[in-house]
């Protein structure tokens, strides 16, 4: 579902400019599930940010396609690594954008998060603030696939994150992450 969501996001919703990856008026994307970075690199290649040679250099020292996203790569807005870090960073970016932009700004910050991200206290603390502040320029896609490094997340976590985020003041929509129409309407 992360692949479907990311494809729809980049192909139909993001305001970006591959020829000017530092453009101030672009939307931001934070891949909190940094270990899935090859997905983003593939999308960045299709959008014109990267070359096929960059993809062939995946995880090589000094390449534009390291094993976790780094801002040296055109189209990457945040370095991420530890789970949950990207959630906090994305919320901080959305807050900074809201505080510094004019009222006509329509820029969004998108966070792509997974099960392991939301289990981290750094993500939950930042999410509490985002809900309280009602950051209308922030959208987080939570890929609830019940998988983590040691097996199913349900073995160690029974939290209903939809209800938890609603209690923190977030607008929550549960969708089929493989259904492109549901993604578009969310």
Please report, for each region that a protein language model flagged, where it lies by residue:
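Cofactor-binding active-site loop characterized by glycine-rich and histidine/acidic residues
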Residues: 1-133
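Gly-rich Lys/Arg/Thr-decorated short loops/hinges at beta-loop-alpha junctions or inter-strand turns
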Residues: 68-75, 106-109, 139-147, 163-170
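Conserved thiamine diphosphate
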Residues: 102-107, 153-186
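Residue-level detector of family-conserved "landmark" positions at structurally sensitive sites
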Residues: 54, 140, 173-175
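Glycine-rich, histidine-containing beta strand-loop boundary motifs that form or position
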Residues: 33, 113, 142-144, 176
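A short, conserved beta-to-alpha structural element at the edge of catalytic cores
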Residues: 77-80, 130-157
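Flexible loop/turn segments at secondary-structure boundaries
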Residues: 38, 118-120, 147-149, 181-183
